[in-house]
Swiss-Prot record:
NCBIfam families hit by this protein: pheS
Required cofactor names: Mg(2+)
Cross-referenced HAMAP family: Phe_tRNA_synth_alpha1
Protein's name in the database: Phenylalanine--tRNA ligase alpha subunit
Enzyme class name: ligase
Species of provenance: Anoxybacillus flavithermus (strain DSM 21510 / WK1)
Subunit-level organization: Tetramer of two alpha and two beta subunits.
Transmembrane domains' residue ranges: none
Entry binding sites for Mg(2+): E256
Keywords from the named record: Aminoacyl-tRNA synthetase, ATP-binding, Cytoplasm, Ligase, Magnesium, Metal-binding, Nucleotide-binding, Protein biosynthesis
Recorded name of the encoding gene: pheS
Cell compartments where the protein resides: Cytoplasm
GO BP annotation list: phenylalanyl-tRNA aminoacylation
Amino acid sequence: MKERLQQLQQEALEKIEQANDLKALNDVRVAYLGKKGPITEVLRGMGALSPEERPIMGALVNDVREAIQQALEAKQATLEQAEVEKKLAAEAIDVTLPGRPIRRGNHHPLTRVIEEIEDLFIGMGYTIAEGPEVEQDYYNFEALNLPKGHPARDMQDSFYITEEILLRTHTSPVQARTMEKHQGRGPVKIICPGKVYRRDNDDATHSHQFTQIEGLVVDENIRMSDLKGTLREFARKMFGEDRDIRFRPSFFPFTEPSVEVDVSCFNCGGHGCNVCKGTGWIEILGAGMVHPNVLEMAGFDSKKYTGFAFGMGPERIAMLKYGIDDIRHFYQNDLRFLQQFNRV
């Protein structure tokens, strides 16, 4: 039996040394020290020994089991350390390598134009006013000199929710609400950026949803010359310092007189090209002097106060500024289109 124990010890130590991972090592542990292992069988056979031999053989079995256990623990520590070192090597970071570039987003071209226009007018002393996109018919039409049944309402089909509630068709209601809050006391000097909605068929130049920026100035002694000077400054900041503007008579129910505003073509310098369709001028916005009826409905004395208003579409400004030929590009989230403005 002593020879058998020494043989088991030698076999176990050899297999422990040969184990190359923790699973193989655990298999050796179970094979030699488990309940069905050979050392347990030796212990069960000690009943056939004489009383004098039992203590000697028991001590020998314990020595063999202790030797195998110590070898197992030492090998386990070695394998665990090797596994940690292997994992660390796989996860090692060379801090001298250049970093991986992080792809960053960029402002949408419409956001760029809107913020540029806002900054321009804020620098001229204007404040930004906002209002609801779901608007009352009164502020969208009636407070702007468009009573129910007025033929000018046919100029823009609207998204009505109820007879008195609709999606605003322009940002002019913000002007009406702001003047109302001033309770007939000037000055008022605001721009109103925001989304508007009209029942247009989407194509290269039309959309059922788009953005507008409208401006309003109300105070004593406001003249058409103030409007022209303001818009000339706007055109030169947006399209170049050598730009000029011209007014063409037009009609809007909420201004009188009303004008369409053209800017001299920034592509050809006014000589005529495909951008300006050979005219040398490009239409960019509508404007006019605030109609006395609009002032009176907002609580202002039209004999004391005058004002001017203007409205533009950032989409059109952006299309002209960046040479974009289809308004739908702004709303399709095509990364090939949007990524071009990283360089702008």
